[in-house]
Regions:
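Noncatalytic, solvent-exposed loop/strand surfaces
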Residues: 1-361
Length: 361
């Protein structure tokens, strides 16, 4: 349909709301949040602090949309609220200054979550490991300093477990749950990777939580024991060492992709037992999303695969190639919305019409 080639340098994905497309990218020494219309035309471009020139330069996070506002955190910890219609800044907080944010070599990479009146994030600093800010003003609502660890690279998930809304996430060496209303640490368990790269959003279902890390750490299913303030290991597989590609739970089956172990298999396993249902090395190392009964898998060098769900796991239905790039270039996950597929790669954003009928020969 179209290609927009002024996204800036970075790995941010896209968020789509109210007929607009939002992303972020680095231009020179500054990071910007951008808004496009559905035809791929730039509507506005608003700065949010300094660009990231450290390891793997470029933007990391995708703006979060909520009730006419965008919430975006840059790699240095500047968290800003913007008017989604105009890009005008409403408030901004320096997480390093307020909470002494501490993070790893690849900077902060968390997509913040909005829950009710709160913006939730994990600065990982001694003045605030996990925090909640008022989404209207940026004022601090609560601070958790019980967690004794620094920020990792994953985005959290918010679920209801044992009657309480809780944020589940990973730090550098822990998987944990925090009460959304109070900030109290509800439970935690060690999850110590071989390489400090915890980037997978935890997958939750009925008291079970799957987390993983790449570079031979592997994937682990935990069962929360909230009364004891911990979570217990149900199973562990070293070959399910997801890195940044995400994992999906569909009808009791867990889908994802290994990093180093198992030859970068795209996998389908039983969620509760870890038993293999199907493995496939042909897709490469992929980032995934699901829509309309299909899985969309973009590998890190530019091959896009459409994967059908089947009784015995999955089947690759079709593939096409974007411009081939080196490993770990196509890191933004595919996004499907309104019958379109959006793919971001560095400066480029592609939009494909999923409803278009093939041209007759």
């Amino acid at each position: 349909m179209w290609k927009f080639s002024e996204c800036g340098k970075g790995y941010s994905g896209v968020a789509i709301a109210e007929g607009k497309i939002y992303t972020a990218g680095d231009f020179g020494d500054h990071e910007y949040v951008l808004a496009l219309d559905l035809d791929g035309k730039l509507l506005w471009k608003s700065p949010n602090g300094q660009a990231w020139h450290g390891a793997s330069p470029g933007s990391r996070t995708t703006p979060t949309y909520n009730e006419g506002r965008l919430y975006h955190m840059n790699p240095h910890g500047r968290l800003a609220a913007l008017d989604a219609a105009t890009g005008n800044e409403i408030w901004a907080v320096d997480l390093k200054e307020r909470f002494n944010a501490q993070f790893g070599v690849w900077a902060l990479a968390e997509n913040v979550v909005v829950e009710g009146n709160k913006v939730l994030c994990l600065p990982g600093g001694p003045k605030g490991r996990v925090v909640a800010l008022d989404k209207r003003t940026g004022q601090t609502l609560w601070v958790n300093t019980e967690v004794q660890d620094t920020a990792a690279y994953c985005s959290p998930t918010v679920v209801t477990h044992a009657g309480r809304r809780q944020l589940i996430t990973m730090t550098q060496k822990l998987v944990l749950g925090v009460d959304v209303e109070t900030g109290k640490l509800l439970w935690s368990a060690p999850f110590v990777p071989k390489s400090p790269q915890n980037a997978l959003t935890p997958v939750y279902r009925d008291g079970y939580v799957f987390v993983a890390c790449g570079h031979s750490t592997g994937g682990t299913l935990f069962r929360i024991d909230q009364a004891a303030g911990t979570a217990r290991v149900v199973w562990h597989r070293q070959d399910l060492d997801n890195c940044h590609g995400g994992a999906l739970l569909i009808d009791g089956k867990l889908f994802g992709c290994g990093c180093r172990m198992g030859g970068r298999n795209f996998y389908c396993v039983d969620f509760l037992t870890g038993r293999s249902i199907k493995l496939d090395k042909s897709l490469g190392k992929v980032g995934i999303t699901a829509a309309d009964g299909m899985i969309y898998a973009l590998n890190h060098r530019g091959t896009m695969s459409l994967v059908a769900l089947t009784p015995d796991g999955f089947e690759v239905v079709s593939q096409f190639e974007l411009k081939k790039k080196p490993d770990n270039t196509y890191l933004a996950h595919p996004v499907v919305c309104g019958g379109r597929l959006y793919l971001r790669c560095e400066n480029d954003l592609f939009a494909f019409d999923l409803r278009a009928k093939p041209t007759s020969p």
